[in-house]
Curated annotation (Swiss-Prot):
Name of the coding gene: acpP
Record organism: Vibrio vulnificus (strain CMCP6)
This protein's UniProt keywords: Cytoplasm, Fatty acid biosynthesis, Fatty acid metabolism, Lipid biosynthesis, Lipid metabolism, Phosphopantetheine, Phosphoprotein
Gene Ontology biological process terms, A to Z: lipid A biosynthetic process
Pathway field: Lipid metabolism; fatty acid biosynthesis
Compartment(s) where it occurs, according to its Swiss-Prot or TrEMBL record: Cytoplasm
Protein name (record): Acyl carrier protein
Modified residues (O-(pantetheine 4'-phosphoryl)serine): S37
């Protein structure tokens, strides 16, 4: 697991209050990790802050799984 992937997963654990073992790459924030719409907004904001990037709303809507978050940050982090 890359350092970037570890950082993304750590943010997910902190933001959603889930156990680290639940944060698998294929996990859906809503269906598997119990996030609601406010949780997902706060998660995107935490990712923006951690990786010093801005995630446009239309892109944020596509970040629905752990892997999607990792992929977005990998492609767009400063």
């Amino acid at each position: 697991m890359s350092n970037l992937e570890e950082r993304v997963k750590k943010i997910i654990v902190e933001q959603l209050g889930v156990d680290e073992s639940e944060v698998k790459n294929e996990a859906s924030f809503v269906d598997d990790l119990g996030a609601d719409s406010l949780d997902t907004v706060e998660l995107v904001m935490a990712l923006e802050e951690e990786f010093d990037t801005e995630i446009p709303d239309e892109e944020a809507e596509k970040i629905t799984t752990v892997q999607a978050a990792i992929d977005y940050v990998t492609a767009n982090a400063q």
